[in-house]
Amino acid sequence: MADTTVDKLATEVGKSTDRLVEQFSQAGIKKSANDTVSESEKQQLLDFLKKQHGGDAAPTKMTLQRKSVSTLSVAGSGGQSKDVKVEVRKKRTFVKRDEAAEAELAAAAKAEEAKAAEVAKTAAEAKAKLDAEAKAKAKADAEAKAKAKVLTEKPVQESAEDKAAKAEEAKLLAAQDAAAKSKADEDVAAAAEVARRLAEENEKRWAEEEKARKEAEKTVDHHVTTSTEARAAEDTADANAEKRGRRPRKPSANAGNNANANAGAGKPGGKGKRGKDNRRDSRNSRNSRNNRSVAPESMDHAFTKPAAVVKADVSIGETVSVSELASKMSIKATEIIKQMMKMGSMVTINQVLDQETAQLVAEEMGHKVVLTRENELEHQVLADRNGDVLAESRAPVVTIMGHVDHGKTSLLDYIRRAKVASGEAGGITQHIGAYHVETENGMITFLDTPGHAAFTAMRARGAKATDIVILVVAADDGVMPQTIEAIQHAKAGGVPLIVAVNKMDKPEADPDRVKSELSQHGVMSEDWGGNNMFVNVSAKTGAGIDELLEGILLEAEVLELKAIKEGMAAGVVVESKLDKGRGPVATVLVQEGTLKQGDIVLCGLEYGKVRAMRDENGKAITEAGPSIPVEILGLSGVPSAGDEATVVRDERKAREVALYRQGKFRDVKLARQQKSKLENMFANMTEGEVEELNIVLKADVQGSLEAICDSLNALSTAEVKVNIIARGVGGLTETDATLAAASNAIMVGFNVRADAQARKVVESESVDLRYYSIIYQLIDEVRDAMSGLLAPEFKQEIIGLAEVRDVFKSPKIGAIAGCMVTEGTIKRSAPIRVLRDNIVIYEGELESLRRFKDDVSDVRNGMECGIGVKNYNDVRVGDQIEVFETVEIARTL
């Protein structure tokens, strides 16, 4: 390396030139800024700086100190606790190995190595000398043999004495050679043994010195020494405090234990325990001077590990999530998930379980289950009602259904005009939707056409507000689509049906035709051996009206309709609305008890105090009995048609129940089973059962309706069945939407549309509504939905075939097959098979696909490519690589 100047060296080390010149001067070297500096001068300056800054005196010992302060709560006199600050100081010293000792060990090792090398050298020299003597002897023997050969050729005859002398000489030479060789071998063996013993002694001595050094380092533990000395000082201080006490301490019952503890202090492992027991006893003795009732406290914890699984009583409500159930059972949620997987159910930690499933899981894991109801307050409020009150006969509630052109309204007008007091004027009060009439044989309550929709809603919620259905059919028109719809609603509600054949005054009336058409829909006349009563009436002349009313009362008598007349009322909401001037208005049909003004009413999600009551004529009333429709004001909101209205005692509890229902309303909707939509029909399939696809069908004309129904019914198989629960001609109405929501059905409109009220129900109830204008499209989509219930089939299709022409080795991938695509296309993402003599020897996937050193996604027929098979290197020339893909084939009907 070339010499550098002082100025350049100052720039390299980051110092000023004057400072560096001064340091050179202090080191005894006279330099200026432009003088050159040699390597020896640099080393001399560095040694001087090290000595000046203490570089030679490297630290041989390092001490670390740590201090921590904590607070300990200790019971004091008088049962009060006091806080004691505890300061813990830790000190640890690390000692560096002595460099002199290391140098001495290194020198000794070097000397031993030199000695062993000298011995080995001596042995090698002896062996070399022996080899030289052997070579010289061999040379002499060769010369002697040559000389003897020359002598033998001479014709002179040797004497017997010469031969004997030569033989003796040869014998002596052989003995000398053997002795010299054995001596050399002994010297070599002795030298090797000496070297081996020296090496073993050195290794043993070095191991002992290293072990002694490590033990010395372990003993120099100032932390242990400090803590031991601190405990000894504390014990001494406690003993001195006891000696300075006013009264001597009386011998206690545990004196023997203390003596044993002190006696065992000298044993190994008893040092720390002795100090701890002494300190605890001294604290107890100090406390005994202040308060004799203080018992010696134990610093050991009282927790014992349970020997078996803890069996607890698990309280389970109507619904509980997996995480909540795990918390109640004091286990991890994964244990519940494992248990449910064993039971055949795949759940997540946040999935909500119903009460029965949660009970089964908890009992399976060995816990006792206590079932609770979150709506206990609701049950208490509804149970706090009438006592043992005898039920009395009540008037029947009759709903009149039928086609709007079949004289239903005229029949209602005639019944009301004939049976209501003559002083009362006006027609039917349409806004209330219900009224009652008095006959000679009893009272009858009628629900008019708006009650039709309310009836469907009530059936959807499980209420039975209607007792009897009157089906009005025009004698000259026969059965119409809305008539069939009314029959379906009556059958779905499970109520008896009375047929009123109207317009008998017309000359073209044909009641037998009506009976024949109704019999095709399951409504059979009593004259034909059926169970349905047929009455011929005329709303224009009044013929047959009395027979109809008598038939209604007779059917009611057969049904034995009874209700409690006295006490707290209960009923059902027929219809409701929001009036601008009066607020929420609900029409309630009282089913039992007596509803009075001022009662607290709990109605579905709403509640309130009855501020006013009106009858069907709009007159204010103060009470209403069973089977009486009444209009009430004062609710907190508009209830839904079909909600149960119940009178309760406490308004505060009614408000709590209403708020609870409102909170649970969303949960109930989310927990409800998924509806039978076309997209998730397969998810709703249950094994071993015949699936049904419920459909509410509406079409524009009767011919299209019949054709669609026949085609859909023909699609039914042993596994999937089409169930058309309602059909008709005309637009989709609110009644159809409510029926579809109640039956988990699909609404299908063929060249028709839904009105505003129906769309509102569809949106609120999440009903699947579909429109079609081509009959084949409708049938195909329903067939696809039914096919979705069948398990799909999977088929493997070969998309490409490549022949291996050559095999190359790659350090990264392994064996690379140089192939020619003979059929189809080779794709990188598709699985492959390796064929040898048309036998599959490997099935896997491609690791690389290249063409001209470029990665490609596919290679077509007739092209060459390089293929790397993943995790397989036994590719040979002549093999075939087959590329295939799995295709899912949906089953069709």
UniProtKB/Swiss-Prot annotation:
Residues 448-451 are annotated as: G3. Residues 201-224 have a biased composition (Basic and acidic residues). Residues 538-540 are annotated as: G5. Keywords: Cytoplasm, GTP-binding, Initiation factor, Nucleotide-binding, Protein biosynthesis. Residues 393-562 form the tr-type G domain. Residues 502-505 are annotated as: G4. Residues 251-265 have a biased composition (Low complexity). GTP binds at residues 402-409, 448-452, 502-505. Its main location: cytoplasm. One of the essential components for the initiation of protein synthesis. Protects formylmethionyl-tRNA from spontaneous hydrolysis and promotes its binding to the 30S ribosomal subunits. Also involved in the hydrolysis of GTP during the formation of the 70S ribosomal complex. This is Translation initiation factor IF-2. It comes from Shewanella halifaxensis (strain HAW-EB4). The lineage of its organism: Bacteria, Pseudomonadati, Pseudomonadota, Gammaproteobacteria, Alteromonadales.
